[in-house]
Amino acid sequence: MKRIGLTGNIGCGKSTVAQMFRELGAYVLDADKLIHSFYRKGHPVYEEVVKTFGKGILDEEGNIDRKKLADIVFKDEEKLRKLEEITHRALYKEIEKITKNLSEDTLFILEASLLVEKGTYKNYDKLIVVYAPYEVCKERAIKRGMSEEDFERRWKKQMPIEEKVKYADYVIDNSGSIEETYKQVKKVYEELTRDP
């Protein structure tokens, strides 16, 4: 089984590219979605996050309010590190459980924001970086409902995209049309599934 990392900065279109790979036949796992699923009541991560950050992060129904949690951790490096420690430990266990059950000829892709920053890209056979310039990323994030301030804060926590592409085995330029992006994705998919 080939294990591929897929990353890029906020607003660059990682999820769009991941969906294209999924449609072509890859098994794609979205790290953010998986981590968000850990926040449901009863999950050990939920318990540990509430114990660590307090009940102030909960909404009226007792669910973790991700916006409240983000407001806390993105303003304090130590708290962010603690949250990542809790969630990433569970994430890696889950990835191992999932990949153990996949067939040998599966193209497994993990979509995750911080593969380069955390050094975990080294655990994968190849790294794909989705690229789009700052202004395009900002516009996309704001269109999705993110505030400009929140975008800036998150953008600054990530390695500059121009630096991140230096780690890539493949770069998908997602600043053009959907058709242009799809052509690049298809080419990369064909290369990854052709090579032994």
UniProtKB/Swiss-Prot annotation:
Query: In which compartments does the protein localize?
Result: Cytoplasm
Amino-acid positions noted as binding ATP in the UniProt annotation, renumbered to this chain: G11, C12, G13, K14, S15, T16
UniProt-listed InterPro entries = Depp_CoAkinase, P-loop_NTPase
Q: Quick one: a GO biological-process term for this protein?
A: coenzyme A biosynthetic process
Q: Which GO terms describe its molecular function?
A: ATP binding; dephospho-CoA kinase activity
- PROSITE patterns the UniProt entry points to: DPCK
Output the CDD domains linked to this UniProt entry: DPCK
Identify the enzyme class.
transferase
Keywords of this protein's UniProt record, alphabetized?
ATP-binding, Coenzyme A biosynthesis, Cytoplasm, Kinase, Nucleotide-binding, Transferase
Pathway(s) per entry = Cofactor biosynthesis; coenzyme A biosynthesis; CoA from (R)-pantothenate: step 5/5
| Sequence ranges assigned to domain DPCK in this UniProt record | 3-196
Q: Which reaction does it catalyse?
A: 3'-dephospho-CoA + ATP = ADP + CoA + H(+)
Q: Name one Pfam family in it.
A: CoaE
Keyword Transferase included in the entry's annotation: yes
What is this protein for, i.e. what is its function? Catalyzes the phosphorylation of the 3'-hydroxyl group of dephosphocoenzyme A to form coenzyme A.
Show the NCBIfam families listed in the entry. Answer: dephospho-CoA kinase
Which PANTHER family does the record associate with it?
BIFUNCTIONAL COENZYME A SYNTHASE-RELATED, DEPHOSPHO-COA KINASE-RELATED
Q: What is this protein called?
A: Dephospho-CoA kinase
Name the lineage: Bacteria, Pseudomonadati, Aquificota, Aquificia, Aquificales
This protein's gene is called coaE
